[in-house]
């Protein structure tokens, strides 16, 4: 049968992974689909299956996804953040919208459904059904109810939207589906398949045995072809940075015969895509080898000491050894751990690996000998906790240095990354540290990137427009948390991705007087991930970031107004010439003297 193009959606690439979501109506006469509208909104459109004019049925600058038709053809369900995250219902005809939730009853269709849509004012017939935000596809069951996963558990929403109920507990469920009988569900949990009743209750693991031949070479060839095809369809630059992507496929296909291990295969893919000279293109090989977890002792070691014991160099504030009952001082020696004598060699880590409780007994002395030592018992830190503590102490020390040098007039705030948790932290700390300051230093050095720079810029563009004053109360600047004072941004060669977009935007919008530090690396592009046969993971750049002058930020990092290099010796000594320069530039400007 001849294929027919219903509608072309530039940039969505249905043939690749990701892109547009679409759903056929119960009578196969309509298609509901999502596509980007404007700069950031995703709206839902409906188009006749035989072609015709598509209609935007959500019409709001918000995120809409997962369109799902009701089995009776009266409603279209979807996820959105248009009025808070949750589940929404669109009535396809006005009479279905006017029915109150109390009177709304599901009647199972007795004959094939014919979907009728009145598009006049359809975007005004939207109702929020549940504030529970789904993390899976929506499933409209034969009984009229909706099912979905959230936080690894199954949720059920009644046809009228008056009841949202969690039918399972314990989480960890993925790949959820309702069976054809409408009474049972299947899902994956812990890598195994289960079946259970749709309304909860006992779950049965589905076990089976099967012989199969794992053709590793064929699997890798399939992964190679899919990797190449995905980049061919979805790489942001159709010109592939001036490279011949077809020729690169042939070049590296010839090398497939020399690949023996998963790591070698992922390396080959990285070499092929590396010729595009684009960032965010990592390929990760699967690993079935369990890696031991090594907790952190909670102090740094002075490696100049040779011989018995670990000489303690520093014990950071907040580490177990900084508290009175478990105090360990700088310069003391750890003679043994749980009775095993130690020194600063690789055997030390074998004593720490894979300890679930991480509780140890240390023998501590002020000299490298067992005689006269005391016992200290505490729980070791995880590597993540150690990194977080070290980071917090460094930020606190830098903030204190800025406030001390400026006599409390200049505030300091570090942005470690650009995730939602970093946004919440920024808003919390900005309110705390901006108050009473004449100027601020925003530091994105070593920022790992993310996606919130636009939100931060919006926040910093809030400007005062008035003052609110109550009787016997201090005046309040309106709007709340508005900032209209001096700013300098610190950045360096380890500010990545969205952490590079932030200083550019601060300068472009006139929010920062100066950018101080070292040019960023130009690791700037919007990316997404995809999977390959064999368990390989890859990332692909899908959207470029251009400055207002048209220059691409990819491989073209942001340059500072004032270049200040930090030498290794300065870093080791705890000096910060970049901060010093920012403080110098933010000193009050001298006023001109009248003759």
Predicted feature residues:
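PDZ/PDZ-like domain segments forming the peptide/carboxylate-binding groove
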Residues: 292-345, 420, 543-544
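Cleft-lining beta-strand/loop regions that shape enzyme active-site pockets
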Residues: 234, 311-313, 318-320, 335-533, ...
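Blade-level signature of beta-propeller repeat domains, shared across WD40, Kelch, NHL, RCC1
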Residues: 70, 74-95, 186-206
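Conserved beta-propeller blade repeats
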Residues: 8-34, 41, 55, 59-77, ...
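Multi-bladed beta-propeller domains
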Residues: 1-20, 35-36, 45-63, 91-111, ...
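Short glycine/acidic-enriched loop and turn motifs that connect beta-strands
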Residues: 37-40, 82-84, 153, 193
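Terminal targeting/pro-maturation regions of precursor/exported proteins
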Residues: 202-276, 280-282, 304-306, 310, ...
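Extended, small/polar residue-biased N-terminal targeting/export presequences
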Residues: 255-308, 370-398, 578, 583, ...
